[in-house]
Structures are given as structure tokens and as C-alpha cells.
Design a protein with these regions (language model features):
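Condensing-enzyme catalytic core mediating Claisen C-C bond formation in acyl metabolism
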Residues: 7-105, 236-314
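Feature representing long, continuous alpha-helical segments
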Residues: 128-132, 188, 195, 203, ...
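Accessory "access/gating" subregions that flank catalytic or transport cores
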Residues: 116-190
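Catalytic phosphate/nucleotide-handling subdomain of diverse soluble enzymes
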Residues: 185-187, 210-263
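Phosphate/pyrophosphate-binding loops at sites that engage ATP/ADP/AMP, CoA/4′-phosphopantetheine
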Residues: 72-76, 100-119, 136-141, 145, ...
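Cysteine-centered functional microenvironments
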Residues: 2-5, 83-91, 117-122, 187-200, ...
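Active-site-proximal alpha-helical scaffold in enzymes
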Residues: 1-2, 7-21, 203-218
Length: 314
């Protein structure tokens, strides 16, 4: 709460089995990476002088030394904020720049072209339509490199000069029927689940894979076809890679109930959501499912802060 990056937040996890002889998707060797230092989204780590803090609360380190908060040998107290510092427009620009550069390096290494050789794409999605909104700026460069910009201009109904530049042409193209059809075929299946979950950070692109597999489950013709992955992490870094679907990949999806997992989630109130972030919630919001759960956190002696877990059997 109370962060400009709040609307990008989500929660979830995706588990994958990585095998030497996979039955669903075989990853290609080629990988493209782009890295550049950027403060587009980060959770600050701040340090405060311990003596100044003690004075601010009306005491001294000597009088407070027997309290575990003050008794550490460090001269500073560090604060790790969970509320991010976020610059949305700048982060979008970083996303496009990193993905475009990483994609170029991937294409050079793989000897492939995303526009021609990928039947679909999975994006890192900090919010629902990030991929489809950012892709026109990147795709126009790819079309231009292949001498196909006139095709985009025809679909957009305006030339680059008439639109007022490449970025304006990308915006016009993104509203065209041709681009909407492109999104429905190549991008939509991979973003459907994330639209209902939100940003899962590292897991986001793999939720895209799960979503795409479910979305393409009735496509028996996709064995041997290549799926592209475009990841991004603020700070900033992108990794682009691809994988080829196995001929019988649909047979491996029988136990995958994505819709059931989404429908059976437990909703919480906004007050509970705020309490979780403020760390004022004193207990779990839902009964524990089978597995290891936090039992208690020790509060005394050398065990101060030690977390104890117990196993719950349903």
C-alpha cells in the first residue's frame, strides 16, 4: 500500500520439473541478455546511526544496551523497506530498451527471427497488458530490419512520416485490426493467467508458460514449434530465450488444472491486505494446508528470532 508500484503487485508460485529429456518443452541453447544499471523500481535499504536513534527516543546506547534491539555490535541500524520506489514511465522505457537489446543478441546467436520463427510469446508481466503494449515499439524495429516496414504502415493506415515518427507509428499500429489479431494468436494465451494474478516477479514468465500451454492445449499442430520468452527485471536486466514444444505436449497437461487453482483462491479484505503489509496481522488468514507451517518465532536468549515450523497433515 501507499506505493506508486502497488498496482503491479501480485502473489503466487510456479513449480517446474527440469529434466534431461523433457516431455513438454525443450529449451534452445541460445540466450540473449541485456543489463544496465537503472533505478526504475527498487526497495530501499537505508542505514541509521544507532546513537542518533537512541538520542531521538530520549536515551543513550549505554542505558539501552541491555535491549536486544540496541545490543548488536553494529554502529548502524539497517532498514529494508518493502514499499518500492517506482517510476512507471521510466520503468516502461527500461523494459523496452532491455528486451530489445536482449532480443537482438538472442537472434544473432540463434540465427532465428522472433517474427518468423516463434509461434507465440511469454512475457514478464508486471501488469496485465505490459507485453502487448510494449511489443509494437520492439516489433517495428524487427520489421524495419527485414525491410517490411511498409507492411506495418499499410496495416496501421498511416506512414511513419505521416504518423510523426517510429513511436507514433507503433501506437497507430497497436490499434489496428491486424495487430489485435496478432495479439490474440501470439501473445494472448501467455498473458491470460497473469491478468488474474498480477506480478509474481521471477515466477511471472513461468506463469506465462503455464497459461500458454493451457491456451494452446487444443492445438495438435504445435509440436516442433518454437515459443519465445522475454523476461525483465527492474534494475535493469532482460533475458530472451526460446523452447520447442514436444509433439505430444498436450498429453502431459491432463493434471494441470490452472482454472481450478485460480477459481479456488481465497479472497481477503482490503483491511487484511493492509494489515499484512503493515505486519500487524497476528495470525494466518486461512487454515493451513498440508505441509510445513510456521509455528512460532523464539523471543528469548540465543534463540531470539529463531523460526520454528511444524508439519500439518490434513
Amino acid at each position: 500500500p501507499h506505493s506508486p508500484g502497488e498496482y503491479t503487485q501480485g502473489a503466487g508460485a510456479v513449480a517446474l520439473l527440469v529434466a534431461e529429456d523433457p516431455r513438454i518443452l525443450v529449451l534452445d541453447d541460445a540466450v540473449g541478455v541485456s543489463v544496465e544499471s537503472a533505478a526504475d523500481f527498487f526497495k530501499p535499504r537505508r542505514s541509521f546511526d544507532k546513537g542518533e536513534l537512541a538520542a531521538a527516543v530520549g536515551g543513550t546506547l549505554e542505558t539501552a544496551a541491555d535491549h536486544p534491539f540496541w545490543a548488536t555490535p553494529d554502529s548502524v541500524i539497517e532498514q529494508f523497506l518493502e514499499f518500492p520506489v517506482f517510476d512507471g514511465p521510466y520503468s516502461n522505457d527500461c523494459y523496452v530498451a532491455r528486451v530489445r537489446e536482449a532480443l537482438g543478441r538472442y537472434e544473432a546467436e540463434a540465427g532465428l527471427r522472433a517474427m518468423n520463427d516463434w509461434f507465440g510469446m511469454c512475457f514478464h508481466l508486471p501488469y496485465a497488458f505490459q507485453g502487448r503494449r510494449m511489443w509494437p515499439d520492439i516489433a517495428l524495429d524487427l520489421y524495419a530490419e527485414q525491410g517490411l516496414l511498409a507492411q506495418v504502415e499499410s496495416e496501421a493506415g498511416v506512414t511513419e512520416a505521416e504518423a510523426g515518427g517510429r513511436k507514433a507509428l507503433a501506437k497507430a499500429w497497436s490499434k489496428s485490426a491486424a495487430y489485435k489479431a496478432y495479439v490474440a494468436e501470439k501473445i494472448g494465451p501467455g498473458e491470460a493467467a497473469s491478468m488474474r494474478v498480477g506480478n509474481m516477479y521471477t515466477a511471472s514468465i513461468f506463469m506465462g508458460l503455464v497459461s500458454a500451454l493451457v491456451g494452446y492445449a487444443d492445438r495438435r499442430d504445435l509440436g516442433g514449434k518454437r515459443l519465445g520468452f522475454l523476461s525483465y527485471g527492474s534494475g535493469s536486466k532482460s533475458k530472451v530465450f526460446s523452447g520447442v514444444l514436444r509433439a505430444n505436449f498436450t498429453a502431459q497437461l491432463r493434471g494441470l488444472d490452472l482454472e481450478g487453482a485460480l477459481v479456488n483462491r481465497r479472497g481477503i479484505s482490503f483491511a487484511a491486505y493492509e494489515a499484512l503489509h503493515a505486519r500487524t496481522a497476528q495470525g494466518p488468514l486461512a487454515p493451513a494446508s498440508e505441509g510445513a507451517v510456521l509455528d512460532r518465532i523464539e523471543t528469548e536468549g540465543n534463540l531470539l528470532g529463531y523460526r520454528r515450523y511444524r508439519w500439518v497433515q490434513n
